[in-house]
Amino acid sequence: MTDSAEIASKITSLIGNDRVRTPRGIEPSAAVVIATPADAAEIAEIVHKCEADKIPIAAIGAARTLSEIRRTPVAIGISLERMARVAAYEPHDMTIVAQPGISIADLNAAMAPSGQRLPVDPRNPRASTVGALIAAHHAGPLRLSEGTARDLLIGIQYVGHGGQTIRSGGRVVKNVAGYDLMKLMNGSFGTLGIITEAAFKVRPAPGNYTLALAAPPTAAEAFAAACALCAAAPFAHLEVTSPRVSATLGLGSQFSLLAGFSGTRAEVDYLRETTARIIPDVQFLADADAMRTYCALRDFDFSATSLAAQIAVPPAELPQALDSCGTEFRAHAASGIAQVMTYDVLTAEAARSTILKWRGLVRNARGHVRVVHAAPEMRAALEFFDTPNNGAFELMRALKAAFDPAGIFNPGCFVGGI
């Protein structure tokens, strides 16, 4: 069903005319009609109706993820904009429970008076929601020291098949019931259900953030320096960027090493001394200058590229994998993860050939590739995810069939068209 008026009328009958609207901003690439339920009960009604009528749906926060990867818009986007508050916060227990539509920036602002934060740093946290953080497994440079949402999630609630509300885990760190279900929802891209609440463990917000910058002559020297730093001390993040990416960050057209660290004044002084001993020509930024450069690094915008993909390999294999790809990159040097990109004007077939080339090279390094940005006209020609071995793929298909037998949750947007 693609007729927007007919779709809208079906949802209006459930939640009212004021809760259904046309897409705006980047949403037209994600959905034909936008529904804005106020709570999990209204989402459950929509799911029940859409299963009966075979109408595909998908959760939408800022719509950024779906607008970047869907080949065609889903019939109904379930906007979580009305579900954007902190449900519970216990500073002494260091836990927080949030609705899926709240942005990471607003979530951390709520904890700032208590000196705490959710230590994940997806691109543009003002436009990155809790729901997308989990469903798309977003992460940034801090994954080196803090992990990802998968490591911090202690409880989850979502609406699934039949409009049922499913809960797993709890609101305290010691409660580990449902551990596997939380892992399953993480990175599922909304194909198993719609998240309505999430509980996280949080951590103290560190102070005195300092950024060390260096410009090694080659990528190999940049990665060697990052490896030496990683072995010497605990850094918050270690990034290596190619010349064009460095220029975008305001660092000049050169290979760049960006090493960030925080802590007490004594800890920061020690890390400065350690860094200077390993990289004699290093430059240090502090306070607003450090944060400005870090934010530019974290928020790097792939929309200026023609094609971008994320690769993940064993950390020791990353320098060679990037050299083989022969492209511009932003690399999380000690994590084995990087984004590779090209700025060349590509046809759909050229884009497909480029992704196949990257996949072959990365597979040789025992890794995998996921497309993170492609122009809409290219998407039909691309497989956004690697295809796993037959056993793993059959397991994924079985899980999809068990969790979403009607096939309405964000169909065709995951591995192998799941």
List PLM regions with ranges:
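N-terminal accessory segments
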Residues: 1-30, 49-57, 62-64, 362-381, ...
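A conserved active-site cap/scaffold subdomain adjacent to cofactor or substrate pockets
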Residues: 215, 225-285
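Conserved glycine-rich FAD pyrophosphate-binding loop
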Residues: 55, 70-75, 79-81, 108, ...
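Short amphipathic alpha-helix segments
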Residues: 6-12, 219-241, 311-327, 351-362
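A generic structural motif
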Residues: 33, 250-262, 335-344
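FAD-binding subdomain of flavoenzyme oxidoreductases
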Residues: 113-121, 125-239
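Glycine-rich N-terminal segment of FAD-binding domains in flavoprotein oxidoreductases
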Residues: 24-89, 95-100, 105-120
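Helix N-cap motif at beta-to-alpha junctions
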Residues: 40, 217-219, 261-268, 314-318, ...
